[in-house]
A protein has these predicted regions:
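Long, compositionally biased, intrinsically disordered segments
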Residues: 133-137, 167-174
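Secondary-structure transition/capping motifs at alpha-helix termini
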Residues: 4-11
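C-terminal non-catalytic accessory extensions
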Residues: 160, 164-165, 189-193
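Catalytic adenosine-cofactor/nucleotide-binding cores of aminoacyl-tRNA synthetases and other
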Residues: 16-163
Length: 193
């Protein structure tokens, strides 16, 4: 009001939005809803966080553990697309900016979500277990040649151990399921190698 009274123009304010939890409420340290940057960096790469922040900078963002896998998969998809794009399209790809014009050229062989599923189904507590599964389907893939994937295995284990394993529930089989499982074990033992 004062600026208008003296005939001057209002200064441009700094536009920013808050971070929201999964319910769309403001993140609060006292409530513990949402995740911190340090937690994100335990579960995913700094580049995935940069990409998450880069997209829609003026819009409020939900920042909770459930967005991490999707953000990582979005990042991996953009890296994969980058190699196939024309030069002018590459400049429009956010990973060009996230990596200061030099995105990695590593072949993306599986999503972070798939690694989380592998970690969950195998109860993996180290990356060697995950690499055994990866190598079943991609024999030519080696950790030292696939830095992104190797880092993702560590992130997947951290995320699984902290966020998924505590919520994991095991169903006790009923009588019919016990019979079926017992029959399956017998059949598997009888298969000749």
């Amino acid at each position: 009001k004062i600026i208008n009274l003296i005939g001057k123009k209002n200064p441009s304010g700094f536009a920013y939005e808050l971070f929201l939890d999964e319910k769309g409420e403001k993140i609060s340290k006292s409530k513990g809803n949402g995740i911190t940057i340090d937690q994100w960096l335990k579960y995913a790469s700094p580049e995935s966080l940069s990409l998450y922040m880069y997209q829609n900078p003026k819009r409020a963002k939900k920042l909770y553990d459930g967005v991490v896998p999707k953000a990582v998969d979005d990042y991996l998809d953009l890296i994969d697309k980058f190699k196939k794009q024309k030069d002018n399209e590459k400049l429009m790809n956010p990973v060009w900016h996230v990596h200061n014009g030099n995105p990695p050229s590593e072949k993306i062989v599986m999503s972070f979500t798939m690694l989380l599923n592998l970690a969950g189904s195998s109860n993996a507590d180290n990356k060697e277990i995950l690499w055994k599964f990866i190598n079943r389907f991609h024999e030519d893939i080696k950790p030292q040649e696939n830095i992104i994937l190797d880092r993702l295995t560590n992130y997947a284990i951290n995320y699984f151990k902290d966020k998924l394993e505590p919520k994991k529930k095991y169903k006790k089989p009923d009588q019919n399921e016990k019979k079926a499982l017992t029959a399956l074990v017998v059949d598997l033992r009888n298969i000749k190698k």
